[in-house]
Amino acid sequence: MIRISDAAQAHFAKLLANQEEGTQIRVFVINPGTPNAECGVSYCPPDAVEDTDTALKFEQLTAYVDELSAPYLEDAEIDFVTDQLGSQLTLKARTPKCAK
């Protein structure tokens, strides 16, 4: 479903080390299926995990996706890119604005 590069996993692991134990990440889509759709990533503390979430286990972390966002995040890619201007996290999803 979602691919998270090694560089992005390392970046998230570094951030998660400063959070409450057991905190992971959540990948989501706001306003899925509309022209205003936006993808995002946030912290996901243990008490925020829902029974209906999909847990995607990676080498350094687990990413949770809610059931409404899941169809819109098929083949999504998260990367952490560094160049001469600095570093940035990128999230590319092909279908967040398409009706499913």
From Swiss-Prot:
InterPro entries: FeS_biogenesis, HesB-like_dom_sf
Signal peptide limits: none
Coiled-coil segments: none
Presence of keyword Transmembrane: no
SUPFAM superfamilies xref list: HesB-like domain
Keyword Chloroplast listed: no
Cofactor note: Binds 1 [4Fe-4S] cluster per subunit. The cluster is presumably bound at the interface of two monomers.
A Pfam family per the record: Fe-S_biosyn
Cofactor needs: [4Fe-4S] cluster
Domain of life: Bacteria
A GO term for molecular function: metal ion binding
Transmembrane segments annotated in the record for this chain: none
Gene3D superfamilies: HesB-like domain (2.60.300.12)
Alphabetic keyword roster: 4Fe-4S, Iron, Iron-sulfur, Metal-binding
Family label: Belongs to the NfuA family.
Subunit structure: Homodimer.
Its biological purpose: Involved in iron-sulfur cluster biogenesis. Binds a 4Fe-4S cluster, can transfer this cluster to apoproteins, and thereby intervenes in the maturation of Fe/S proteins. Could also act as a scaffold/chaperone for damaged Fe/S proteins.
Protein name as it appears in the record: Fe/S biogenesis protein NfuA
